Design a protein with these regions (language model features):
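Acidic/polar-rich alpha-helix caps and helix-coil junctions
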Residues: 1-29, 64-250
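Short, cationic low-complexity segments
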Residues: 34-53
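Non-catalytic, low-structured ubiquitin/UBL-interacting segments
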Residues: 56
Length: 250
């Protein structure tokens, strides 16, 4: 995985924040590392919706990116007891056990006990560029789109799924899924989900989640996403900011 201390600034990386637990005080690892995965100072607040995981797994069952992206089965760093969440357990009886952790930015050293860690934050990498070029090529219909996607997938021993081999519209849907499979959690999820407009966001993200059958939407552990464009396509400005901004006249 490129998301390790030992594989920082590799040939795929275009821009990384250079971090050190002794200087920059990054709490990324603390926030992403599953509870009790390492010795101390970790919370694992950030998860991936179970249905997003299943879409990825169903599309590419043998994808090595899955283990590099998600964490759902590990041992307690102190007691050695098994710690499992979905899909290692499928009952989904409570929120904590219902969604896998996002493992990319987690601290990988189980003996680590510092509040901060040293793993760099990858801001932009070559795979992101290739997917963008594939998307552009598909819109231009210049015949280059499949080559870019193939380069991304071949590096992990995979080949493009069938959606990339169909029509322009089918390729468009496939590339938007590929952004998610490859880049989830790297800072562009909200933008990528929305940049094709509300209708596309509604049909390919919101309703896909709200009506999913694998593992199945469950009100007690899943968030029902709003279908109101006024609340989903804009980022509300806090009233306190509006009240104190002297450049706003009315």
């Amino acid at each position: 995985s490129i998301f390790t201390d030992s594989n920082e600034n590799n040939s795929e990386s275009i821009f990384e924040f250079q971090l050190s637990q002794d200087a920059t005080n990054s709490q990324m690892g603390r926030n992403y590392t599953p509870l009790n995965y390492k010795m101390s100072q970790n919370f694992g607040w950030f998860r991936v919706n179970a249905d997003v995981f299943e879409i990825h797994r169903n599309m590419y069952p043998n994808d090595p990116r899955i283990d590099a992206t998600y964490m759902y089965d590990y041992t307690h760093a102190i007691t050695g007891a098994p710690q499992r969440t979905y899909p290692a357990i499928t009952t989904r009886t409570n929120v904590r056990a219902s969604h896998p952790f996002l493992f990319k930015f987690a601290e990988k050293d189980k003996t680590h006990s510092n509040q901060y860690n040293s793993q760099n934050i990858v801001v932009y990498r070559y795979a992101d560029l290739l997917l963008m070029l594939a998307e552009i090529s598909n819109e231009l219909q210049n015949g280059q789109q499949l080559g870019y996607v193939t380069e991304v997938l071949n590096r992990v021993g995979m080949t493009p799924q069938v959606g990339f081999l169909g029509s322009q519209e089918e390729f468009r849907d496939a590339i938007m899924n590929e952004y998610r499979f490859e880049l989830i959690g790297e800072g562009e999820d909200a933008h990528n989900n929305r940049r094709r407009g509300f209708d596309y966001f509604l049909n390919n993200t919101i309703l896909t989640h709200n009506t999913n059958t694998n593992p199945g939407f469950k009100a007690s552990v899943d968030i029902l996403l709003s279908t109101d464009p006024t609340g989903t396509m804009t980022l509300p400005i806090p009233q306190s900011e509006i009240n104190t901004n002297e450049l706003i006249n009315n």
